Each structure stands twice: as structure tokens, then as C-alpha cells.
Amino acid sequence: MSHAVKIYDTCIGCTQCVRACPLDVLEMVPWDGCKAGQIASSPRTEDCVGCKRCETACPTDFLSIRVYLGDETSRSMGLSY
């Protein structure tokens, strides 16, 4: 089952989520929207196993990264009833 990884604009560019991911799903890319000048990106979501270690590692109170497991992804997109 595939999962979706969403990075929100509350990301502070700290790299904690990237370092926490055991499968190298995440990477940092340039972004001018924060002081660090970079934001997390999830180019390899097909490799995500849904462990949510990235969520746990995120230091922001806004939880700047969310992993939506397969069922959650379908519901949030209105694909299941």
C-alpha cells in the first residue's frame, strides 16, 4: 500500500526528518521561504514504509511533515466511502 508524504511550509529546514528516515525517502532542496534557505522534499515516496520517524523527529509545533498511510490518503482525497 502506498503512502503520501506532505511537507508543509512551516518547515524550518533543520534536516531532522531527512536524517531520521531509514529509507532515504526525503531530501533537502533550496527554498527561500525559511531562514535555512532549504526545505524537505519527498521525491521517493514509493519507498516510504509509513514508520513516521520523520514526524517524530520534526521539532516544529506545527508538525511540518506528515505521513498519510494508504487508507488515510484515500479518505483525505475522497477516494473511499
UniProtKB/Swiss-Prot annotation:
Span of domain 4Fe-4S ferredoxin-type: 2-31, 37-68
Catalyzed chemical reaction(s): reduced [plastocyanin] + hnu + oxidized [2Fe-2S]-[ferredoxin] = oxidized [plastocyanin] + reduced [2Fe-2S]-[ferredoxin]
EC number: 1.97.1.12
Record's keyword annotation contains Transferase: no
Cofactor binding note of this UniProt entry: Binds 2 [4Fe-4S] clusters. Cluster 2 is most probably the spectroscopically characterized electron acceptor FA and cluster 1 is most probably FB.
Gene Ontology CC: one annotated term: plasma membrane-derived thylakoid membrane
Protein name in the entry: Photosystem I iron-sulfur center
Organism of derivation: Synechococcus sp. (strain CC9311)
Organism classification: Bacteria, Bacillati, Cyanobacteriota, Cyanophyceae, Synechococcales
Gene that produces this protein: psaC
